[in-house]
A protein has these predicted regions:
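Extracellular glycan-recognition regions
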Residues: 27, 268, 280, 368-369, ...
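Aromatic-lined ligand-binding clefts that engage carbohydrates, nucleic acids, or primary amines
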Residues: 301-315, 347, 469, 492-494, ...
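Short beta-strand-plus-loop segments that form exposed binding edges in beta-rich domains
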Residues: 348-355, 398-399, 735-742, 795-799
Length: 816
């Protein structure tokens, strides 16, 4: 369609005249946000967040924005029959879970006492009519359930479920249905344990810390795997998807961890000169006092030492002490180029005592890098909506060096998959904004100009007998089964002529119709808190307001599209999943900012050329910037199709692949043959030629076809590269030629992806700056001279079969 031209002020054109594409800037969440607190749980209630867990001693920390936790209140004291006479007290409050249900706040946590007298490792349950307590245990004579890490999830039909960890097959995740009074409605059912010979078993058999949400009709469980100790450095977060709350299993797991340590890209992308300095594999013995290594070439960039030690290990490189006086390190240290020699180099380790331990050591030749403490062991997740109600945020513990604290990072959904923008620190490159605040917050909508697409969150006070909300021509009242004596939390999403309402997480109005021309809003009852934010969240067939476009099961059909939606704004986020059923052609994308037909910013995908195109039209004159969409990514085998004989690596959409990188160093994740000492490098097996032991195949429809390849230099001694003619595929298969060769090296590979049929475009505008992301990679930034309101929209040239499978848009108000 042809978009209507509007009269503009000259200032608007001047603003667009200043558009330019530049390198991506940086604005970071400042992790950690709460120091010294480990396994914790978080609840959002009436515009505030409450956090409790390890080292809170029965207290809650309180925040308005997830970043500042300046208030602390005492809410609970451990006092029951089964902990009396032991050392278990408030110091044994672990892994809080805080839920509001039926007019009560429910606090569940693990008592985690491992004493010389006895072990007390159980889950207990306490309640309070108010969030600030005091919480009292429901039963003092017995515990609630076994064993650790509880989480209560309320499904949209009101059914409650308890997720927990039992010590069965290692640490194993179980689920159990509950009644509304928190009594049990059935037996516990095992969900899954850690999968042998995957990233989940780099040391111990651990699956723990479950946290479940439902979003866009799918259930997502985040969990931890591997040992939590930073000495191992293997603790990571994974995700499992399911179609039902008790249907989580190995087949629903993402093959990859969604959050890992920031040491991982260091090792993946850089050569360790201590191990590979002369081009051959020379494992490091961390127990040695003298480590000798050869370097057969000059340093190209700058040397950096990754050093992890505790208990006072003084480390010297060629006689120069790099950590003088330090009792503990887990950091990246810049090294003077002059200290690194061509030929033999010597590292000496002087240990202060018998408990001094060298945990990790590597020397990289890198371009300029951020130095300082490293981030690792992300774990014990809680997932909450952000202050504006649209965003999802992960609250989790992680180590900054050896200190464990609370961190936050943004969650996005990319191609339907849950993705975490982390692990981040203040030094992480790129754009990682703090949580957005609601456009309006208070106890009423007085003075608010309501649009036709928004989120309204209302917390009604207890004993408010007339709780109801009217949206346009629809009035939603409190269901009869919900008590008006209790306060209730409402979530109302209006999208043009579609209305969706949840009360206490229960879906009471499921994408029902509302008069699109009636913007009236009325809130009845005593309001404790209310927030309002423009935006919409669309998926499936639930699209509205896109003039001339229709939706089917694949989403919004774009065809030939040139269409805007919504009011103008100056700060906003727009995320669109674009699915191309004909990935060899088409030009499609989004309007990142539209003033009129002569002044706009458009970001599109050119499928034939596999490029991201950023167009800047100013007074009718267009300049263009192009960025390749090709990328190299770590790729883990899908356990649904893999075993010790063969590995299959799947793609979520048709993907053009032209090379594979194979790790020469086996991971040491065979739990039946591994010594669980920390000094694993000397145990790992190195294979110079991995490819010759494997037959490679690509999936063509439902037929596996053999890949004819050649080997090339990879630029990294730990990776062997094979290249081949590009194939468009949904999967790769690697089969061991020798049945006794179990393919431990290929527990992960790297794949060279030239283009994928599905791409998640995300536009994040903050006033004068527009950040452009494709599949969570920031590829460009557009700068405007002035802060002029603009529309957003969708575009397609009509030459490809393209759907917008989901669209999330909301106006951003930045924290003050």
């Amino acid at each position: 369609m042809r978009m209507k031209t509007e009269n503009l002020l000259k200032a608007a054109a001047a603003a667009f005249a200043a558009l330019c594409v530049t390198a991506a800037g940086a604005q970071n969440v400042s992790n950690p946000v709460l120091e010294g607190i480990a396994d914790a749980g978080v609840i959002k209630y009436a515009g505030k967040y409450y956090l409790g867990g390890v080292a809170t001693y029965g207290d809650f920390f309180v925040s308005d924005n997830l970043t500042d936790w300046n208030k602390r209140i005492h809410v609970f004291d451990l006092d029951n029959d089964w902990t009396h006479g032991t050392g278990a007290g408030n110091n044994q409050v672990h892994a809080d879970d805080i839920t509001y249900s039926g007019g009560l706040f429910h606090l569940l946590f693990s008592v985690n006492y491992w004493g010389d007298d006895r072990h007390i490792v159980h889950i207990t349950h306490a309640t309070s009519p108010t969030i600030d307590g005091p919480f009292e245990e429901v039963r003092k004579d017995q515990w609630f359930e076994n064993r650790i890490d509880p989480q209560v999830f309320c499904d949209e039909d009101g059914q409650l479920y308890l997720y927990m960890v039992k010590f069965t097959d290692g640490n194993t995740i179980w689920a159990r249905p509950m009644n509304s009074d928190f009594s049990f409605a059935g037996d516990a059912v095992q969900q899954f344990s850690s999968q042998p010979e995957t990233w989940e078993t780099m040391d111990n058999r651990v699956a723990e810390g479950p946290f479940v949400i439902k979003y866009r009709g799918r259930y997502y469980m985040m969990y931890n795997a591997n040992h939590t100790a930073p000495e191992y450095g293997n603790y990571r977060l994974g995700v499992c998807e399911a179609a039902s709350p008790m249907g989580f299993g190995p087949g629903g797991k993402y093959p990859w961890p969604v959050v890992g340590p920031d040491t991982e890209p260091l090792d993946n992308d850089n050569t360790d000169l201590i191990v590979y300095g002369n081009g051959t594999f020379n494992p490091v013995n961390l127990d040695a006092d003298t480590i000798r290594f050869d370097i057969d070439h000059a340093i190209k960039n700058h040397p950096y030492l990754k050093l992890a030690q505790r208990g006072g290990c003084e480390v010297a490189l060629n006689g120069h002490v790099v950590n003088a006086g330090s009792k503990a390190d887990y950091r990246l240290i810049p090294i003077d180029n002059k200290l690194v020699r061509k030929g033999e180099n010597i590292i000496t380790v002087k240990r202060a005592g018998k408990n001094s331990q060298l945990v990790a050591l590597a020397l990289y030749d890198m371009a300029d890098a951020k130095t300082g403490d490293l981030m690792l062991t992300p774990g014990q997740p809680s997932i909450v909506r952000g202050p504006n109600g649209w965003e999802w945020w992960l609250v989790y513990m992680a180590n900054k060096a050896w200190k464990r604290s609370q961190h936050i990072d943004r969650i996005h959904f990319t191609g339907g998959r849950l993705y975490v923008d982390g692990i981040t620190s203040p030094d992480t490159e790129g754009f990682h904004p703090v949580p957005a605040m609601p456009q309006h917050a208070g106890t009423s909508l007085d003075g608010v100009s309501v649009s036709d697409a928004y989120l309204l969150e209302v917390t009604f006070a207890a004993h408010s007998s007339d709780q109801a909300v009217s949206i346009g021509d629809r009035r939603i009242s409190l269901p009869s089964q919900m008590s008006s004596d209790a306060g209730h939390v409402w979530r109302i999403e209006r999208n043009h002529d579609i209305l969706t309402v949840w009360i206490d997480n229960v879906l009471v109005c499921d994408h029902e119709s509302v008069d699109k021309d009636n913007r009236a809003v009325d809130v009845s009852g005593t309001v404790e808190y209310l927030s309002y934010n423009d935006g919409y969240d669309e998926y499936g067939r639930h699209f509205s307001g896109w003039k001339g476009l229709t939706a089917d099961d694949g989403g919004l059909k774009l065809g030939q599209a040139d269409v805007l939606k919504g009011d103008r704004a100056t700060s906003y986020e727009m995320s669109v999943q674009l699915d191309n059923a004909t990935p060899d052609r088409g030009r499609y994308g989004v309007y990142a900012a539209w003033q009129d037909e002569k002044n706009y910013v458009r970001v599109t995908i050119d499928a034939a050329r596999r490029m991201l195109i950023t167009e800047n039209c100013v007074k009718g004159k267009t300049t263009t910037s192009e960025t390749s969409l090709a990328r190299t990514e770590i790729h883990y085998p899908d356990v649904k199709y893999s075993d010790s004989f063969e590995k299959q690596y799947r793609f979520d959409s048709d993907t053009y692949v032209s090379f594979i990188l194979l790790p020469r160093l086996a991971p040491g994740n065979n739990s039946y043959a591994r010594d669980l000492s920390l000094n694993v490098n000397t145990q790992r097996k190195f294979r110079t030629d991995v490819a010759s032991h494997i037959d490679f195949y690509w999936l063509d429809g439902d037929t596996w076809r053999k890949i004819e390849y050649k080997t090339e230099e990879s630029g990294h001694p730990d990776w062997q590269k094979i290249t081949f003619a590009p194939v468009c595929t949904r999967g790769l298969r690697l089969i061991n030629k020798n049945p006794r060769d179990y393919g431990h090296n290929t527990y992960r590979i790297k794949t060279g992806r030239d283009f994928s049929a599905t791409c998640q475009l995300r536009i994040d505008r903050r006033g004068k700056t527009i950040h452009v992301f494709a599949d969570n990679r920031e590829l460009a930034t557009v700068n405007l001279k002035n802060n002029i309101p603009a529309h957003t929209g969708l575009y397609s040239d009509g030459t490809a079969d393209v759907h917008a499978a989901n669209v999330l848009y909301y106006v951003v108000k930045e924290a003050e």
